[in-house]
Amino acid sequence: MGLKEKRFTKTFQEEQFPQLKTQIIEAVGFDVPLAIEWETLFEDRFLHLYNDSYPKIYFLPLIEAFKAITADEMGKEALAESLREVRITNTKDHHNPTNAYSFAEGVLTVDHSPILNADNVEERVKVLTDLLESNL
């Protein structure tokens, strides 16, 4: 990760991430640890798009899926009992949400390209909600 990426990450962490993290905590109902591998979330030529794509790819689907799961007490309890951590990374440049999400041993992993199909938020929400409902 070069200086440009480090500057972007710092700015994103200071300006957008706190609000997104608060929304995740509110949606999930507790302060779930977020393990974000920031250094993997870059492709040089797309740096100018990340302010828009990061929330759409990594955070808004989590918020909406957690809201769907915690819509009732049964969902709140299941999530609180099962979810230990959310890990966000990009190791395989997945752009299809079916391949980008996994849930094992209490860890929800989001392994998605930082840019591809950014506007497909609803599809990611559906796949993520289905994954959680099947594994909680």
Give the residues covered by each predicted segment.
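Short amphipathic alpha-helical segments that mediate assembly, nucleic-acid/protein binding
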Residues: 5, 17, 21, 59-62, ...
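Extended hydrophobic/Leu-rich segments
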Residues: 8-12, 24, 42, 115-116, ...
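Acidic/histidine-rich, surface-exposed loop or edge segments in extracytoplasmic proteins
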Residues: 30-53
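Active-site recognition of the HExxH zinc-binding catalytic motif
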Residues: 110, 115-136
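Auxiliary, metal-adjacent structural segments of Zn-dependent hydrolase domains
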Residues: 46-117
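Acidic, contiguous N-terminal accessory segments
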Residues: 16, 23-24, 30-34
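N-terminal leader/targeting segments
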Residues: 1-17
